[in-house]
From Swiss-Prot:
GO terms under biological process: translation
Assembly and interaction partners: Part of the 50S ribosomal subunit.
Keyword Translocase: no
Function: This protein binds specifically to 23S rRNA; its binding is stimulated by other ribosomal proteins, e.g. L4, L17, and L20. It is important during the early stages of 50S assembly. It makes multiple contacts with different domains of the 23S rRNA in the assembled 50S subunit and ribosome.
PANTHER family associated with the record: CHLOROPLAST 50S RIBOSOMAL PROTEIN L22-RELATED, LARGE RIBOSOMAL SUBUNIT PROTEIN UL22M
Gene Ontology CC terms, in alphabetical order: cytosolic large ribosomal subunit
A molecular-function term among this protein's GO annotations: structural constituent of ribosome
Superkingdom assignment: Bacteria
Keywords, comma-separated and alphabetical: Ribonucleoprotein, Ribosomal protein, RNA-binding, rRNA-binding
Biological source species: Chromobacterium violaceum (strain ATCC 12472 / DSM 30191 / JCM 1249 / CCUG 213 / NBRC 12614 / NCIMB 9131 / NCTC 9757 / MK)
Protein name: Large ribosomal subunit protein uL22
Keyword field contains Ribosomal protein: yes
Amino acid sequence: MRVSANLKSVRLSAQKCRLVADLVRGKSVDQALNILAFSPKKGAVIIKKVLESAIANAEHNEGADIDTLRVTSIFVDKGASLKRFTARAKGRGNRIEKQTCHISLTVGN
């Protein structure tokens, strides 16, 4: 049994989010929640919400036992970039890109 949860267009770069995703891949759900609760990174808060959603999906839709669930797969893909300008000297402007990412998490036995 595999249950997934997805989150699209998160305002965080995929590179920074993958650092947190690597911490919880393959861990049990309880252990993953503890790791995410004590991680100081912004991505930890976001991934924790996705993990809690996947746990709720497994419990509600499949009637799964939470104690046996593991994070079977988690991957972070690059999303669309928000193009913005920042002011520079002499009336010029430089383009900056605000990165987004898509998080896909799967829990199972």
